[in-house]
Amino acid sequence: MIDNKLKLVIKVVLLIFLLHSLMSIFNLETYIKILAKYQNQIMIIAIIILSGLIIVDIASEVFKKYARTREEKAGEYLTLNYIFKYLVYVCVTLMIFGVIYQNVSSLVVSVGLIGAAVTYALQKPILNFAGWIIILYTRTIKIGDRIFIKNMGAGDVFDIDTQHIYLSELTTDTFEPTGRVLIIPNSYIFTASIENLTKGSPYIWDNIVVHFTLNSNINKAEKIVFESADEVIGNLMRELYEKWSKRKYLISRKLSDKPVVRVGITRSSFYIKALYLVNVYEKAKIRSEINKRILEKVNKENDVKLAYPHIKAVIETENKFKNT
């Protein structure tokens, strides 16, 4: 505690010394006269900046209030907040340039030169900014969406700014939280394939594959897998079928009111695959419950066995008799 106070005192003394040295070297009266000459412009710029900050602060509170009261559209309100905030910043910047450069031709030339230099030096940030504009305009991604980016990972979007998309990282197989944050440049919208798992509807097709030994009763195995999936997710699929079958733009053959079962064969087993609709946010929970029911049902059957990797050794013995 004493060391911190001592450091603070030293910094204050050093600051006073530096300011005194600066005043002795430069003629401050000259600079004060220059500032006084432009005092009106300085006051106008200060008022513009303060007004812009106040407007942004008030608007942010309004948008956040609506986001809290209408959770289903929270992402849209937060995105509108970003758009409004940066529009205010752009307007404030243009107004400041207008105050400084009263000559329009000088303003245009200055902005052109500055823009060319900035574009060359900040290519990636500008590309990220362009990606941000595309995201806001096309609404392909919004806060609250669950997305997957190839070779990057999956996660829930919790923030989007002018440069990056921020994700709460999830595992790519069961979408379990990892506790990490993925920061994705907005330019990926131009170069990478991004899967939005919740756009339009949070329901996706998931599947469970269960391998059985070749001598298991295939009919019982198929029944076990189907019934386990139907008991867990069947009611939801029937509700969605009733709801979606009334929509004209959906093709009826793509809908199903119950889990779909497929059978396949491998070199050492056969497998039953169950396909079903599930809320993407409950994928891990539903898969776990179906697996649990399958195990419970298999354990009750004598002629149904789960296959697993193993090696079976067959030893043949041969009796040899020698003539004595």
Curated annotation (Swiss-Prot):
Main localisation, per the record? membrane
Biological-process GO terms, alphabetical = transmembrane transport
Q: What GO cellular component entries does it have?
A: plasma membrane
Q: Where is this chain's protein located in or outside the cell?
A: Cell membrane
User: In what way does this protein cross or attach to the membrane?
Assistant: Multi-pass membrane protein
Looking up SUPFAM superfamilies in the UniProt record yields: Mechanosensitive channel protein MscS (YggB), transmembrane region (SSF82861), Sm-like ribonucleoproteins (SSF50182)
Listed transmembrane segments: 8-28, 42-62, 80-100, 116-136
Gene3D superfamilies the record matches: 1.10.287.1260, 2.30.30.60, 3.30.70.100
Q: Which Pfam families match?
A: MS_channel_1st (PF21088), MS_channel_2nd (PF00924), MS_channel_3rd (PF21082)
Which keywords does this chain's UniProt record carry? Cell membrane, Membrane, Transmembrane, Transmembrane helix
Q: Which InterPro entries match?
A: LSM_dom_sf, MS_channel_1st, MS_channel_C, MscS_beta-dom_sf, MscS_channel_2nd, MscS_channel_TM-2
Identify its protein family: Belongs to the MscS (TC 1.A.23) family.
Protein name per UniProt: Uncharacterized MscS family protein MJ0700
Which taxonomic lineage does the organism of this UniProt entry have? Archaea, Methanobacteriati, Methanobacteriota, Methanomada group, Methanococci
